[in-house]
Amino acid sequence: MGIKILRYFFICIGCIATGAAHAQPFANEYRIALVLPFHSGGYHGSLGEAMLDYYTGFRMAAEDLEADGLKLQLYVFDSEKDSNALNTTLYHPDLKTMNLIVGPVYDKEMAPTEKFCNLNGSVLISPLKFYKPASEETKIINFYVPDSVRIASIACKAANFYPGYKFYLATDNSTKSKEYLAIMKRQLTKCKIKNSKTLIYTGAAIGANALAKDSVVVLSSISSTSAKDVLLTAVNAKKNGILFAHIDWHNASMSTFEKDEPKLIYPESNFTNPADSAAVRFRTAFMNRTYAEPSKYAYIGYDQAYYLCLSLMTFGKDFILHLPDADYRGFINTIHLQNSKCGVQNLGINYLQIVEDERREFKP
């Protein structure tokens, strides 16, 4: 993998496959540009460090796929090297030849980049936050989505996990809770769960007769963690009961000491399974390269690059038209891309349990 320095931009990396024996199915060479806020021209803050980790993970994924026949030219631009960096980047003669443009991060920079992609036929990738495109014609992939989309995805996944169960939707009747409850109910109906019932949380214990005798799934639209113990107590009283947590209940830094919650499932965007030997090898390789622990952005960069590059290799530059209806489990993210009115959105979510003091990936 050759490297050359660009005078006006951050760096440009050419990733060119060398194994002729692997090149037959993937004869095309693809071009990807990372346009991210590295802050290479001044103060190196936490965001710049995060972007360097993302870039390193992205590049490591490209290198791994190079052995399988990937031919890639990877360009890297600093969108915040100075006040005019993005404009300078958008006028770079090579940028119009890109198949994918990953970034920038902020909406004010995404808007002109969206116009550029529409003009030149590139797919725009929003890697770290949701960006609503100005045009429905924009080819865009949002790897992170609004909470409303995540709520709908959780309801659909619960229906797929437990098709024969009785579903209850817990609400405290707050405005946001009722909004999420309506989303869940619509999604369950789409997934052929037609008789879900509403469970009102008032702060008091839930009576024994409030839930069916067996095979119960409770979805919480209540953000307050005070509801967790009450709902979990009710679910634990059932032989086959499951509680899907609200998306705000899990915090990656919270202690799991003396916790055992096998009937509680936490939705979480970012989770690295400590038992994943491939993730352990990635961590070791990253540390050998950078002499530092990989942050979550390194894992995110690897997962996104692997998915995008593998899609290019499999389906070509129009892969966005041939997205598989399946989960891809990376080192930290689950990716499941699906078309919507706001472009392509990632509906993939990790599902965790805390069992005997340890976080574990939930596998039904």
Predicted regions and their residues:
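N-terminal signal peptide c-region/cleavage motif recognized by signal peptidases
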Residues: 16-20
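Extracytosolic ligand-binding ectodomains
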Residues: 2-11, 21-364
